[in-house]
């Protein structure tokens, strides 16, 4: 149980950190032309620009993923201290929150990927996904692993019973 909880805490912390970095950086998409290159993220800087709906969806679900991941990691930390939290409930709440974070991040990444993938290419400009985009996908995988490990910690943990009264 301790190994599962420790690994879940490590995976959740990394997933939360990667999710925050992906959300806050602007290297999701890169375009390289004959003389210039440009990159963009989820937070366009041009004033008065019309922001596409898929960007708003990606922003919303990414923020939800960060919040769920924060809840998951918080309950994992609290479950390490039995005097602060009743035994058995921390990993279960963490499992639910981690899976919710993973699903939110997968939705955000799938929407962004499908919309960018369908954009018509320009013959003189090479476009590709950049490192912030890939960090978002890695965070989704880490959050999914956190949910599975938290579930393992919950199932392998002590059950509250008559002896705890």
Curated annotation (Swiss-Prot):
The main location class comes to membrane
Query: Entry's InterPro entries?
Result: PMP-22/EMP/MP20-like, PMP22/EMP/MP20/Claudin, PMP22_EMP_MP20
**What induces it, per record?**
By CSF3/G-CSF. Up-regulated in CD4(+) T-cells from peripheral blood mononuclear cells of patients with visceral leishmaniasis.
Task: Output the Pfam families linked to this UniProt entry.
Answer: PMP22_Claudin
Q: Which tissue types show expression of this protein? A: Expressed in activated T-cells, in kidney, liver, lung and pancreas. Not expressed in brain, heart, or skeletal muscle. Expressed at high levels in TCR gamma delta-expressing CTL clones, and in some TCR alpha beta-expressing CTL clones (both CD4+ and CD8+), but is not expressed in other TCR alpha beta-expressing CTL clones and in cell lines representing B-cells, monocytes, and myeloid cells.
Recorded GO cellular component terms are: cytolytic granule; cytolytic granule membrane; plasma membrane
Which key words tag this protein in UniProt? Cell membrane, Cytolysis, Inflammatory response, Lysosome, Membrane, Transmembrane, Transmembrane helix
Asked if 4Fe-4S is a keyword of the record, the answer is no
Subcellular location, in the record's words?
Answer: Cell membrane; Cytolytic granule membrane
* Membrane-crossing residue ranges in chain numbering: 9-29, 61-81, 92-112, 133-153
Its membrane topology is listed as: Multi-pass membrane protein
In its UniProt record, which GO terms are filed under biological process? CD4-positive, alpha-beta T cell activation; defense response to protozoan; granzyme-mediated programmed cell death signaling pathway; inflammatory response; killing of cells of another organism; natural killer cell degranulation; natural killer cell mediated cytotoxicity; natural killer cell mediated cytotoxicity directed against tumor cell target
Instruction: Describe the family membership recorded for this protein in Swiss-Prot or TrEMBL.
Output: Belongs to the PMP-22/EMP/MP20 family.
What PANTHER family has UniProt attached to this entry?
A: EPITHELIAL MEMBRANE PROTEIN-RELATED (PTHR10671), PROTEIN NKG7 (PTHR10671:SF34)
Describe the function of this protein: Regulates cytotoxic granule exocytosis in effector lymphocytes, thus acting as a critical mediator of inflammation in a broad range of infectious and non-infectious diseases. Essential for cytotoxic degranulation of natural killer (NK) cells and CD8(+) T-cells and for the activation of CD4(+) T-cells following infection. Plays a critical role in CD8(+) T-cell and NK cell-mediated cytolysis of target cells and contributes to the cytolytic activity via the perforin/granzyme pathway by enhancing exocytosis of LAMP1-carrying lytic granules.
Q: What is this protein called?
A: Protein NKG7
């Amino acid at each position: 149980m301790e190994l599962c909880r420790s690994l879940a805490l490590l995976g959740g912390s990394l997933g939360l950190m990667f999710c925050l970095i992906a959300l806050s950086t602007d290297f999701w998409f890169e375009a390289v032309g004959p003389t210039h290159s440009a990159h963009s993220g989820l937070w366009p800087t041009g004033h008065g620009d019309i922001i596409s709906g898929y960007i708003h969806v990606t922003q919303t679900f990414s923020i939800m993923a960060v919040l769920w991941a924060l809840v998951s990691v918080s309950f994992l930390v609290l479950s390490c201290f039995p005097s602060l939290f009743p035994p058995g409930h921390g990993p279960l709440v963490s499992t639910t929150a981690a899976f919710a974070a993973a699903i939110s991040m997968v939705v955000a990444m799938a929407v962004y990927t499908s919309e960018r993938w369908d954009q018509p290419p320009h013959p003189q400009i090479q476009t590709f996904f950049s490192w912030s985009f890939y960090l978002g996908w890695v965070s989704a995988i880490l959050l999914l692993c956190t949910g599975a490990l938290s579930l393992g910690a919950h199932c392998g943990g002590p059950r509250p019973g008559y002896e705890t009264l």
